Amino acid sequence: MFKVDNSDLRRWTGDVTRGLRDLRAPLTAAGNVIEAKVAEQFQREVDPDGDAWEPLSPDTLKNKEGGSILVKTGALRDSFEYEVDGDTLTVSSSSPVFEAHDQGIPPIPQRQILGLNAEDKNQIAGIVKGYVRGSKGRRR
């Protein structure tokens, strides 16, 4: 799990966000971006930086009936959700095996799922900046 909170937004967009009271719209848009990114990572079998996940071991391949890395039933892939609460966006997984795979707990190799690369951060900053520009005329 990770959070994008108001301190991150202020750093990304400067002091202009201080005048904003309701960040739900840009945080929801950012949550949608992250959700789509996670789905793409499962499809491409890559971490947030685009590096390939470690291949399955021969033992795992023997016991696995098709499917891709980290997808046996789809439960882990489909377990990600985000929540906007005030000025905080929380992205998490309800899967009990998420942390073992994301962090790598031996003998399971790390196959990072959640995280933001520089391009993701720029995209989210662009969403917030667009919202800030659109709100300037609405502030009191």
What is each of the regions a protein language model found here?
Residues 1-140:
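Short, Lys/Arg-rich flexible segments
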